[in-house]
Curated annotation (Swiss-Prot):
BP term (GO), one: carbohydrate metabolic process
Quaternary organization: Homohexamer.
EC number: 3.5.99.6
Gene name as annotated: nagB
Name of the featured protein: Glucosamine-6-phosphate deaminase
Swiss-Prot/TrEMBL site (Part of the allosteric site) positions: S151, R158, K160, T161, Y254
HAMAP family: GlcN6P_deamin
Function, as annotated: Catalyzes the reversible isomerization-deamination of glucosamine 6-phosphate (GlcN6P) to form fructose 6-phosphate (Fru6P) and ammonium ion.
Length: 266
């Protein structure tokens, strides 16, 4: 596992965007051989999306031959609701880059057959071979996507009941009213994430410090879903300074020295 310790959310977003752009450009995708990118929603990736849009506008990257799969979607929220993840992705990213509509894959939280929708999503991912890079965030309780504590580390795309803590955390997007936050969501599984060629998780703020500590210094534990990254051959965590407050001094020093060349010029 790599840990990239930075100072601010802006630096985290910029580092993540540069990493994605390098991966896409090194892959040199074509129509017949697209780069497959997994994407998250929420507040954490916003700086990364801003930086990706800037790099696209500067001619540094094209998304014409990139295929995307999003991590999750609320169940029962209309697609055009401002807080649906469909709306979020178009508003904050897709509308600003050159990705073709047919290359965008989002879970349908209003599908008449939820189980069939989850199977369809998994099958479509498999049809592309694998996701080359999956970017994600993490919840205060260590959840990745909506894989809440005690999720199976072998799980696939499915419906999940959201914990009260997750709904409270997300209520800030719903006018502070937890009752407006859907109780269920569709989410890729932990196993789906671990199948990706590379997983990059962004961690911001002191409220994520326990989750980061569990990911880096704790044991693999289904109560801290983020700890599954220890099982992945190519995992990278990009974090800001407040999120590192629970790490041991020697742990942080180790990764800071190890990544010194990779965190310059931000």
């Amino acid at each position: 596992m790599r840990l990239i310790p930075l100072a601010t959310p802006q630096q985290v977003g910029k580092w993540a965007a540069r990493h994605i752009v390098k991966r896409i450009n090194d892959f040199n995708p074509t129509a017949d051989r697209p780069f497959v990118l997994g994407l998250p929603t929420g507040g954490t990736p916003l700086e990364a999306y801003k930086a990706l849009i800037e790099m696209h506008k500067a001619g540094q990257v094209s998304f014409k031959h990139v295929v995307t799969f999003n991590m999750d979607e609320y169940v029962g929220l209309p697609k055009d609701h401002p807080e649906s993840y469909h709306s979020f992705m178009y508003r904050n990213f897709f509308d600003h880059v050159d990705i073709p509509e047919e290359n965008i894959n989002l879970l349908d939280g209003n599908a008449p057959d939820i189980d069939a929708e989850c199977r369809r999503y998994e099958e479509k991912i498999r049809a592309y071979g694998k996701i080359h890079l999956f970017m994600g965030g993490v919840g205060n309780d260590g959840h990745i996507a909506f894989n809440e504590p005690a999720s199976s580390l072998a799980s696939r795309t499915r419906i999940k009941t959201l914990t009260h803590d997750t709904r409270v955390a997300n209520s800030r997007f719903f006018g502070g009213d937890v009752n407006q936050v859907p109780k269920y969501a569709l989410t890729v599984g932990v196993g789906t994430l671990l199948d990706a060629q590379e997983v990059m998780i962004l961690v911001l703020g002191h409220v994520k410090a326990q989750a980061l500590q569990a990911a880096v210094e704790g044991n693999v534990n289904h109560m801290w879903t983020i700890s599954c990254l220890q099982l992945h051959p190519k995992a990278v965590i990009v974090c800001d300074e407040p999120s590192t407050m629970e790490l041991k001094v020697k742990t942080l020093k180790y990764f800071t020295e190890l990544e010194a060349e990779n965190i310059k010029d931000l």
